[in-house]
Amino acid sequence: MMRVRLIGFTASVLLLLGCATTTPETVKSAEIPGSPTSNLAPGQCGLFGWSTDDTRSFIFYADEKSARYASADGPIDLNAQSAFPATEYRDTAGDTVSLRLGEGETMVGGMRYPSARIATLTDEGWERLQPVAIIKTCKPAE
C-alpha cells in the first residue's frame, strides 16, 4: 500500500513539474528598419544583437560595411572605426558607440557573446550600457 502511494505521489509531482516548466511563448523580435538581418552574401560575416530583457528585441546589426543600432532615441546608422568585427563605432553626429563583447563561446556556425554591452554617452556625459546578446556568424563561401 505504501509503495502505491509513493508511486502516485511521484507521478503527481512529475506531472506538476511538467506543467510548471513549459517553454514560454516566443516573442517576435522587433526588426531594425533598413537592416539586412539575414541577407548575408556568401563569404560575408555579420554581428546580430538582441536585448537581454523579456522582449528579446533585435537591436544591433553589423557587417563589414555597415552597422545599425536601435538606441533609446531610435535607430541610428554607425560607421566602424576598425576592421570587422569592430568594437568602436561613430554615429552620424560623431558620437562614439562602443561594443563590449565580453567572454565569447563557440557555437555551431560562429560565436556567441551572451553578456555583451553597447556603451553610449548621454548628453550629460554619463555612460549608458545596454545589455545585449551578440551572435557572430559567417555565411560559407560558395
Residue ranges and their predicted role:
Residues 16-18:
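C-terminal motif of bacterial Sec signal peptides marking the signal peptidase cleavage site
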Residues 21-142:
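Cysteine-centric segments in proteins
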